[in-house]
């Protein structure tokens, strides 16, 4: 994160207004403006582990990562700058959480790209902090209001649930495939062999559906799940518990917090980070897998057919197979052999 996003560039047009403010930055924090903007004091709260990694290097303990912000996270702040995400329920979860903690009279700024639906912030906050649009540039809108009433926030009311082939899947706003199993994951699941054994790592686990479905027909696997998203980590833990499946779940930026080697790594890797297209996570996954696979171990991922992963797989593993495909998706398989680069 070095170049500023369009949303941050709009905020910089008003930088003089923030010099005396004690600011809490939250939402879709795609760059390091929270660490660089000239303010009286700055804090940041994010649900994205990779964003926290960048900000904490510059802000220390003033950058926090968690599903739910606490009173300590917003202490002494008189201004909220909220970056609108692409997901409206995610925005509602985060804003209701933050506004329930901030004191009445807090200045509220909401900024985001028009295509993300930032306009709906006005309606969402109408009862708590009526907003007015104060700037429009770089295809973004900047809205300002003042907190008049704190909402009541109950994180439990945001949980969702659905069933897949008799399995219970727990979800939260911001979790991939929140409303049902996506087609890509269905295709990947169709390729998993029953009675598999060994250590399995699910990278970018989302709500945990891949892992619990795999464990149902391969009960002897030992599961580890990770994701950059705090909602995904909590949803996966809840999904495992709901299906009486054991596994370790933690936040990690691809392999950043992963220790040891595995017999199989499975993933439906993301190719968006917020509103931005990004292949970084998937390429990091493929290249880093060789440092976390046992000899003979396997990487199995599903991806949109148009994405350029075959070259990275061949470069890293020496070869790959396509073991299932539809018009839109392909499931790739690569084996850890002597040909594979050792990272």
From Swiss-Prot:
Primary location: cytoplasm
Any single Gene Ontology cellular-component annotation: cytoplasm
Cited CDD domains: AdoMet_MTases
UniProt key word Transferase: yes
Source organism superkingdom: Bacteria
Pfam families: MTS, MTS_N
Family in the record: Belongs to the methyltransferase superfamily. RsmC family.
Protein name per the record: Ribosomal RNA small subunit methyltransferase C
Species this chain originates from: Escherichia coli O7:K1 (strain IAI39 / ExPEC)
Gene, per the UniProt record: rsmC
